[in-house]
């Protein structure tokens, strides 16, 4: 069953992960819930690697010009690392992944204080009007709170920056900087 567990009710309450980000691997843990349209959130497993890989290629194809090309081995390694040492949550509808957020604990270069940072956050275009994006981010934030560490989320290399900023701000997050690159 790939770590799925259905519960009834809204997507607001958490069944909680089996481990915190500091507790090691979360692959195979039970972390599911249902909401509207049979949306299921669950922790990803290694069985999801190829679906996540294909999803992230779609995400990359929608970025602005000037984005570095995908190196297959590196992308596979990063996904595998996140599956084994980080947090990867997938949203499913009818047994198919429609979105995901993945991240790792890290620290700023000047500090030992850990925070949970996203490596990716993506929902397929045809599911962006669903609650998938909202429930993925809320679950990621909840995992950080449960582990008593801050969460930092970002979005770069994509259009529609203002809409994405507003999305994060509606979740109580504050914008803390910008990223610039040569044209």
Locations of regions flagged by a protein language model:
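A short, internal acetyl-CoA/4′-phosphopantetheine-binding micro-motif in the GNAT/acyltransferase core
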Residues: 119-130
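A conserved beta-turn-beta hairpin within the catalytic core of GNAT-like acetyltransferases
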Residues: 107-118, 176
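Conserved acetyl-CoA-binding loop-helix of GNAT-fold acetyltransferases
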Residues: 129-142
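A short beta-loop-alpha structural element at the N-terminal edge
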Residues: 39-54
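Conserved beta-strand in the GNAT
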Residues: 90, 96-105
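A short helix-loop-beta-strand connector motif used in the catalytic cores of GNAT acetyltransferases and
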Residues: 78-90
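Conserved beta-strand-loop-alpha-helix junction that forms the acyl-donor binding cleft
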Residues: 152-164, 181-183
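Conserved GNAT-fold acetyl-CoA-binding loop/helix
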Residues: 57-78
């Amino acid at each position: 069953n790939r770590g799925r567990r259905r519960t009834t009710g809204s997507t607001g309450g958490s069944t909680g992960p089996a481990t915190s980000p500091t507790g090691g691997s979360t692959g195979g843990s039970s972390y599911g819930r249902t909401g509207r349209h049979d949306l299921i959130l669950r922790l990803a497993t290694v069985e999801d690697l190829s679906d996540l890989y294909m999803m992230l290629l779609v995400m990359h194809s929608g970025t602005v010009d000037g984005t570095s090309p995908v190196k297959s081995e590196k992308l596979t390694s990063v996904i595998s690392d996140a599956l084994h040492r980080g947090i990867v949550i997938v949203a499913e509808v009818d047994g198919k992944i429609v979105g995901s957020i993945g991240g790792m604990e890290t620290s700023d270069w000047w500090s030992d204080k850990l925070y949970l940072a996203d490596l990716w956050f993506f929902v397929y275009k045809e599911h962006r009007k669903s609650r998938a994006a909202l429930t993925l981010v809320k679950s990621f934030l909840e995992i950080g709170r449960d582990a008593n560490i801050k969460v930092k989320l970002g979005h770069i290399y994509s259009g529609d920056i203002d809409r994405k900023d507003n999305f994060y701000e509606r979740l109580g997050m504050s914008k803390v900087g910008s990223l610039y690159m040569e044209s």
